[in-house]
Amino acid sequence: AWWVEDEMEYGLADSSPKVLFCDEERLNRFLNIRSKFADLTTVGIRLKDSRPGVTDFAEVLKTGGELPDISVDPDQDACIFYTSGTTGYPKGAQLTHRGCSHNIMNMGFGGQLALLTSCKMNNLEPPNPKDAQPMKALVTTPLFHVAANNCLAHPATASGGKLVLMYRWDAGEALKLIEAERISFLSGVP
């Protein structure tokens, strides 16, 4: 997040994560409060230099993709997004696995409804679902925002799609990525 140290400390204490993924900027903030979170595993992304006690994300990727076989209660928390905190400290909004799954289904239904409505209004034949290509989404919003996760990452992952991440918004870079990656879906802030 874009939190300053005291906000970061509050969010970490409130959510009790096991692993913290952070880039250079957030890592620098975290290192000032790290002693309060001694058991927190820290993974660095886009780091300029290695840091003691911080695992580089490239090393994580080398370990392979095997995940443990676990049982998930659909009503357990899947993620926590924090509000902006306009009336005090940010509040953790918890999303369940069931809620995230329903969101994916609702987005799929809404997308198909919009497509079929557009085809009908324009006297076009709907495309054959067998010809559908996986989503290729350009993510221009921060991953700590619900829009990037629920509206892009979840449906793209569920459909076998591709996410192309922009670290910071740059219109020229976005155009290059759209062309090079053949982006089919873009969501951004007006």
Q: Where do the protein language model's features map onto the residues?
A:
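Short hydrophobic/charged patches on amphipathic alpha-helices used for structural packing
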Residues: 9, 69, 172-175
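Active-site charged/polar residues at nucleotide-handling catalytic sites that mediate phosphoryl
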Residues: 15-16, 37, 180-181
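Adenylate-forming
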Residues: 22-31, 46-50, 141, 167-172, ...
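ANL superfamily adenylate-forming
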Residues: 25-77, 89, 101
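Conserved pre-ATP/AMP-binding loop-to-beta segment of ANL
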Residues: 64-82, 89, 119, 126-136
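Conserved AMP-binding A3 loop
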Residues: 78-118
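Conserved AMP-binding/adenylation subdomain of ANL enzymes
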Residues: 101-140, 144-185
